């Protein structure tokens, strides 16, 4: 019997009882936490290079936000959301995605017309899915939203941003897939024909697909349970219903991508999982040669009606999101190694030394140096092997033979005298010595 099936009385009688994390959630620590933070830091730096500002919104939102934006017939709203009533009987939801929350925040705080109209985010999302590789009930997304007029250049820039971000990880088999869902009028004309076509195959649909057939047949194309069947593959293509202006913009985008050496393929079946998308949609897909399967690692698109739908003005926007855990899986398979930072150990010979050096150590850390120190065990010979085994390259200590305070390179044994120097002089000398030693080491390779 699992612990969550036990009564309170039974739990009280279980000695050494251990509560486990819920199914589909993760703990990150040590190497996993380093990898997690590395991905967030990489995204943050890339987002700021493209002039995005950070935005944070609540994990908890009103259910209606996602019902109105993501779409009633989507898998996320119809099957996967964590929904509950609060004590005031208001229907709440844990956010399954971030775009709706970001737009709600921008509308509510009157930021839609703000000059700073690019925002990036990261945080936990929640979907009640069957946990498997790359799919979790709590997962972390990084993403961005750009409130910008519909143009082929803004479409291109968002793809360039996504491509540059993923380029930091040197994945071998990542394919950019793009499609155009058209504007509202084009899509409505298409849906009329799509509905007529699907009515011929009503007997092949389950209850959920029949509901989608009436409310939004486009969602049937996104259903992974049936979209491999021939009658789905042979359905009318939305691209055939686009007007010349929409097609021209899409062609311009393709030319920009070619000129920038960003390889891509057009996937006319690509619709994405949310109802708010129109015009450009895209996914960066990783192809696993061993399992011959595809894993979407980043996806997004343009949305022209969501801002107005959530009470704002008629305004265009575009954005994307990526799953951090999926990126972690791929980087771990690539045998990712934590970027090495030069580390220093400051040895304190006694408690007096320890208190005297606290400010010195803090100021070294402020100079972007990784510094460790001993707070007990004041015998250097007892901890020297541990310092070396941790990969620490530089040691600052009082050398009794030389009667000097020195910084020593533990690899080549070079050292520099720091005796009788002011704290600021010591810090500058340490920084210069480390830079010089690292430069000489790199030149000798």
Swiss-Prot record:
GO terms for molecular function: ATP binding; histidine-tRNA ligase activity. GO terms for cellular component: cytoplasm. It is an enzyme of class 6 (ligase). Its EC number is 6.1.1.21. It comes from the Bacteria. SUPFAM superfamilies: Class II aaRS and biotin synthetases (SSF55681). It is found in: Cytoplasm. Transmembrane segments: none annotated. It catalyses: tRNA(His) + L-histidine + ATP = L-histidyl-tRNA(His) + AMP + diphosphate + H(+). Gene3D superfamilies: Bira Bifunctional Protein, Domain 2. It holds the Pfam family tRNA-synt_His. The keyword Translocase does not apply. InterPro entries: aa-tRNA-synth_II, aa-tRNA-synth_II/BPL/LPL, His-tRNA-ligase, HisRS-like_core, HisRS/HisZ. Keywords: Aminoacyl-tRNA synthetase, ATP-binding, Cytoplasm, Ligase, Nucleotide-binding, Protein biosynthesis. GO terms for biological process: histidyl-tRNA aminoacylation. Belongs to the class-II aminoacyl-tRNA synthetase family. Homodimer. This is Histidine--tRNA ligase. It comes from Mycoplasma mobile (strain ATCC 43663 / 163K / NCTC 11711). The lineage of its organism: Bacteria, Bacillati, Mycoplasmatota, Mycoplasmoidales, Metamycoplasmataceae. The gene is hisS.
């Amino acid at each position: 019997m699992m612990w969550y099936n036990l009564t309170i009385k039974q739990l009280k009688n279980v000695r050494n009882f251990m509560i486990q994390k819920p199914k589909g959630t993760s703990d990150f620590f040590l190497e996993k936490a380093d990898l997690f933070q590395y991905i967030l830091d990489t995204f943050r730096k890339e987002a700021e290079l493209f002039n995005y500002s950070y935005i944070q919104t609540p994990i908890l939102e009103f259910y209606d936000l996602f019902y109105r934006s993501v779409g009633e017939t989507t898998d996320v709203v119809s099957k996967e959301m964590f929904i509950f009533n609060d004590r005031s009987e208001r229907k709440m939801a844990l956010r399954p995605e971030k775009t709706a929350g970001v737009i709600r925040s921008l509308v509510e705080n009157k930021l839609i017309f703000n000059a700073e109209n690019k925002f990036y985010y990261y945080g936990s999302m929640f979907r009640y899915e069957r946990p498997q590789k790359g799919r979790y009930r709590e997962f972390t997304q990084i993403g961005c939203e750009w409130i910008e007029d519909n143009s082929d250049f803004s479409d291109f820039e968002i793809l360039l941003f996504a491509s540059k971000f993923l380029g930091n990880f040197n994945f071998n088999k990542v394919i950019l897939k793009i499609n155009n869902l058209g504007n509202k009028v084009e899509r409505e004309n298409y849906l009329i024909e799509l509905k007529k076509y699907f009515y011929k195959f009503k007997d092949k649909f389950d209850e959920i697909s029949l509901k989608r057939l009436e409310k939004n047949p486009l969602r049937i194309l996104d259903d992974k349970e049936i979209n491999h069947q021939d009658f789905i593959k042979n359905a009318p293509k939305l691209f055939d219903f686009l007007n010349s202006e929409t097609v021209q913009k899409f062609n311009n985008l393709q030319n920009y991508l070619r000129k920038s050496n960003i390889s891509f393929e057009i996937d006319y079946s690509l619709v994405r999982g949310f109802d708010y998308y129109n015009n450009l949609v895209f996914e960066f897909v990783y192809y696993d040669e061993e399992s011959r399967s595809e894993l979407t690692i980043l996806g997004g698109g343009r949305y022209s009606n969501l801002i107005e739908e959530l009470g704002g003005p008629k305004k265009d926007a575009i954005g994307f999101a990526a799953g951090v855990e999926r990126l972690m899986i791929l980087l771990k398979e690539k045998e990712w190694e934590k970027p090495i930072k030069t580390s220093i150990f400051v040895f304190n010979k006694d408690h007096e030394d320890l208190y005297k050096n606290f400010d010195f150590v803090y100021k070294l850390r402020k100079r972007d140096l990784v510094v460790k120190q001993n707070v007990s065990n004041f015998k250097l010979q007892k901890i020297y092997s541990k310092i070396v085994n941790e990969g620490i390259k530089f040691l600052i200590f009082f050398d009794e033979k030389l009667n000097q305070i020195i910084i020593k390179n533990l690899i080549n044994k070079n050292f520099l005298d720091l005796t009788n120097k002011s704290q600021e002089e010591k810090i500058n000398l340490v920084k210069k010595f480390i830079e010089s030693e690292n430069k000489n080491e790199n030149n000798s390779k």
